[in-house]
């Protein structure tokens, strides 16, 4: 099975919460990693998402933590952050 990993940066202007993370996260830029696998048997390349993770500061120290999240929850957090600025 062919897989690929996409990386993107998302930014939050204010502290935020997201399902799957047990604490409030500070404002800032976060790396989001999405793993996708190719759907076999099609006449064109098509991928489906199999995992989405966000890199967040660990509760203590300078380490980073990778946490699995639902992409819909990430979208909700981004909308709330954008709406809070209006």
Predicted regions: what is each one?
Residues 17-19:
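A general beta-strand register signal
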């Amino acid at each position: 099975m062919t897989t690929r990993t996409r990386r993107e940066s998302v930014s939050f202007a204010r502290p935020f919460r997201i399902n799957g993370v047990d604490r409030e996260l500070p404002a800032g830029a976060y790396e989001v990693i999405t793993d996708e696998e190719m759907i076999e048997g099609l006449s064109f390349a098509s991928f489906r998402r199999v995992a989405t993770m966000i890199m967040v500061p660990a509760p203590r120290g300078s380490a980073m933590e990778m946490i699995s999240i639902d992409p819909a929850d990430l979208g909700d957090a981004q909308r709330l952050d954008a709406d809070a600025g209006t």
